[in-house]
């Protein structure tokens, strides 16, 4: 594991166009009532290449509990201020399981991002989440 981390750091140091972002998690909309829509939290996202990035952080989830997340993201479209991608990773802090796999599409324009997370349980909800993505380097 430490070799993998060292390789990632080495590769990210070699890429001059890589950027790091502060993620400010903030709000969500659910298609069913009873869920928390104020999802404050912070995260870090780092570009590994023109199309690949990794991210991790914490937020207050839709069940009013603390969650940590980590994911890899592939940006399949980057033009002007648009950045469209697909992310795959894992999240903690939900009642359903201690760690839940996740995959979601995300659309960013300038600093504003929106993601869509589909319902995973019959009694759950589809959710659209919103956050800011601010360059810090």
Task: Tell where the protein language model's regions lie, with residue ranges.
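Short glycine/proline- and aromatic-enriched beta-strand/turn motifs that initiate or cap beta-hairpins
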Residues: 17-60, 67-69, 133-137
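Transmembrane beta-strand segments that form the barrel wall of outer-membrane beta-barrel proteins
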Residues: 22-30, 52-61, 82-94, 105-107, ...
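Feature captures outer-membrane beta-barrel proteins of Gram-negative bacteria and organelles
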Residues: 39-48, 66-79, 99-111, 126-137
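Short sequence motifs at beta-strands and strand-loop junctions characteristic
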Residues: 34-36, 62-64, 96-99, 122-124
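N-terminal signal peptide c-region/cleavage motif recognized by signal peptidases
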Residues: 12-15
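Positively charged n-region of N-terminal signal peptides that target proteins for export
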Residues: 1-4
């Amino acid at each position: 594991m430490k070799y993998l981390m060292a390789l990632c750091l080495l590769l990210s140091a070699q890429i001059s166009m890589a950027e790091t972002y502060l993620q400010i998690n903030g709000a969500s909309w659910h298609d069913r009532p009873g869920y928390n829509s104020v999802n404050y939290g912070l995260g870090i996202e780092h570009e590994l290449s023109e199309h690949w990035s990794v991210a991790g952080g914490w937020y207050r989830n839709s069940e009013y509990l603390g969650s940590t997340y980590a994911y890899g993201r592939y940006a399949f479209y980057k033009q002007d201020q648009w950045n469209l991608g697909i992310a795959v990773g894992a999240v903690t802090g939900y009642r359903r399981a201690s760690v839940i796999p996740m995959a979601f599409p995300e659309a960013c324009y300038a600093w504003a991002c929106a993601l869509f997370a589909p319902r995973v349980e019959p009694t759950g909800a589809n959710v659209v989440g919103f956050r800011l993505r601010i360059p810090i380097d």
